[in-house]
Amino acid sequence: MKTVLLATNNENKVNEIKDILCELNLKVVSLKEVGINVEVEEDELTFMGNALKKALTLYNMIDDKKYMVLADDSGLSVDVLGGAPGVFSARYAGEHGNSKANNEKLLEDMKGLKNRKGKFICAMALVIDKDNIIKVQGEVEGSIGYEEKGDNGFGYDPLFFVSKYNMTFAEMDKDIKNSISHRRDALNKIKEKLKSYIEDK
């Protein structure tokens, strides 16, 4: 069976994906583990566009076709802002990865707005081979708070409120957050589709 190569060096992401896909008896490795150091520019207009670009770029770089390549792109989509921050989630305030500035800009943009519905979206693309690509999208719905709450997580987590749990992502225990997250939703879908693919072989 092939090995799944993850198009990321984010250790939290790597561990979460390994935990879920291990049920299929697949070996999962990160870029670091196979000695690849590459950044693919995320310049597509959709989460799926970025995920697909990353997965295909890496797949085409690798000579050893024993690898399937899994890539994802995710972010926050706010209804009243027309889907923003969207694909610009990580650089909403201009500087890439400045969560504090991004959260401040989001709060400023939503000042006085009553409709605070939003969702985290995770698009995943798994390139099995050039003729077989699995694409899925996971989501988790919530609302945008009026101030940051909680010390866990990262990014927009302190502002993302989930009414079922009456707390933000940043206030949740990591295991709870991971069990309901947009990434978990996408991974579960990938797992089911991959399971069907393996069974058909």
From Swiss-Prot:
Residues binding substrate, per UniProt: T8, N9, N10, E11, N12, K13, S74, F154, G155, Y156, D157, K177, H182, R183
InterPro entries documented for this protein: dITP/XTP_pyrophosphatase (IPR020922), ITPase-like_fam (IPR029001), RdgB/HAM1 (IPR002637)
Molecular function terms, GO-annotated: dITP diphosphatase activity; ITP diphosphatase activity; metal ion binding; nucleotide binding; ribonucleoside triphosphate phosphatase activity; XTP diphosphatase activity
Entry-linked Pfam families: Ham1p_like
Binding site for Mg(2+): E41, D73
Active site (UniProt): D73 (proton acceptor)
Enzyme Commission code: 3.6.1.66
EC supergroup of this enzyme: hydrolase
Cofactor binding note from Swiss-Prot or TrEMBL: Binds 1 Mg(2+) ion per subunit.
One GO cellular component term noted in the UniProt record for this chain: cytosol
Catalytic reaction(s) noted: XTP + H2O = XMP + diphosphate + H(+); dITP + H2O = dIMP + diphosphate + H(+); ITP + H2O = IMP + diphosphate + H(+)
Keyword terms: Hydrolase, Magnesium, Metal-binding, Nucleotide metabolism, Nucleotide-binding
GO biological process: nucleotide metabolic process; purine nucleoside triphosphate catabolic process
TM region(s), chain numbering: none
Cofactor: Mg(2+)
Function: Pyrophosphatase that catalyzes the hydrolysis of nucleoside triphosphates to their monophosphate derivatives, with a high preference for the non-canonical purine nucleotides XTP (xanthosine triphosphate), dITP (deoxyinosine triphosphate) and ITP. Seems to function as a house-cleaning enzyme that removes non-canonical purine nucleotides from the nucleotide pool, thus preventing their incorporation into DNA/RNA and avoiding chromosomal lesions.
Protein family according to the UniProt entry: Belongs to the HAM1 NTPase family.
Classification via PANTHER family: INOSINE TRIPHOSPHATE PYROPHOSPHATASE, INOSINE TRIPHOSPHATE PYROPHOSPHATASE/HAM1 PROTEIN
Oligomeric and partner information: Homodimer.
Protein name: dITP/XTP pyrophosphatase
Species lineage: Bacteria, Bacillati, Bacillota, Clostridia, Eubacteriales
